Amino acid sequence: MQQIVILGGGAAGMAAALAAAQAAPAGAVRVTVLDRNPRCGKKLLATGNGRCNLSNTGIAPACYFTADPKALAPLLNAVNTAAPLEWFRALGLYTRTDEAGRVYPYSNQAADVLALLEGHMARLGVEVRTGCTVNTLSQNRNGYAVLFDSAERSNETLHADAVICAMGGNAGPQFGTDGFGTRFAAQCGGKLEPLYPCLTALQTARPNKALAGIRVKARAALLDLDRHTLLAEETGEVQFTDYGLSGICIMQLSGLLAPRRGPKRPAVELDLFPSLDEAALTALFAARVPLLPGRTPADFWTGLLNPKLGRALWAAARLPDTPLDTLPDAAWQVLANTAKHWLFEDLTPCGWKQAQTTGGGLSLTELEPSFQFRGCPGLYFVGETLDCAGMCGGFNLHWAFGSGITAGRDAVRTLRRPHKKR
């Protein structure tokens, strides 16, 4: 009996295993999953705050961060052709879509998605071995040999006619990921793009700890200070932290901070009043003074902004702490300009523990549209190991499930082709 071995039991690995088992002739192919955790899908359970944001109705190449957008196009087309949502519905999963296009299981439970995957894998005879650490992969004339340590013994060897590497990236080490997937890809001769934490909060050089926990609707723009250019902007909720800035729109911008191709001097500019232009905001500020019961800067923000945030903005504008009616008219233009262009410099992405996904990884140029490693029939790489990080909103799980399904199906189709060493 021929065998397909999947290295990693996360979203991509389970999708690959189940898709292969579905495509294989009955009794002809053994599908085996090796995972280092006590149970598959540990990280999946945490996605979408436990609700499992499966996909998005707005899937497009522009929603992914990669060093090679041209190489992404055929791979993303293959992922979309795999139709992960239709595949899940055929497994019995009913979904719902919110106003932002994010797709969730109707139950809002990531545990239900995992239970369906586990149940169908068991039904089709997929062997799942947990507590396994892969050491090496070698190629021979008959296929591949996987050397690994299991919970029972060290240096076990498993023969494989095809291998699908789904060992994840560096993000979320608390879920059992440690970057071995990308190191493994390099050991196989693959070109790696530099790794970086993606979809993460940003540290600033001089965080205002008094603002920690405050949330505000704002427009956040990522600037390249050296080139004086606007790189991207997002509108949404910004959260101030004791180390800097967070919130979904900040996390989206973090994807552009890739080594080598990202800005050398990035900065985030916040617009706290995105619905007003600067002239209208100046007029609003000036008109408030006679309306307020008090005449101090502390009174100024009542009913307008969180008072702590207002005090920080006042300080950023370098206005004196004097009665409001003593300030010149020009002060309101200065304050409005600061509120529309509040600059945060010296940015550093937070580490792997806070990152939702991994930027960089195995170059997409190394892959066929089937996710097969070029020059190595029967060897595939899928999911977060690859240089393709999606934005927040279900794009990463869509990529993980779709790449796994594509590779699993193709592995069955190519089993009888002769293996040639790269």
Identify the residue ranges that each predicted region occupies:
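Glycine-rich FAD pyrophosphate-binding loop
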Residues: 21-49
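Glycine-rich active-site loop/strand segments that organize a redox cofactor
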Residues: 49-97
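Glycine-rich loop(s) and the adjacent beta-strand/alpha-helix scaffold that form part
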Residues: 162-208
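An anion/pyrophosphate-binding glycine-rich loop and adjacent beta-alpha core
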Residues: 38-40, 46, 54-61, 191-194, ...
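Beta1/beta-strand and adjacent pyrophosphate-binding region of the FAD-binding site
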Residues: 1-12, 32
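Short hydrophobic core segments
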Residues: 5-7, 34, 134, 157-174, ...
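A glycine-rich dinucleotide-binding beta-alpha-beta segment and adjacent secondary-structure elements
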Residues: 130, 310-389
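A conserved short coil-to-beta-strand element within the FAD-binding core of flavoproteins
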Residues: 130-143
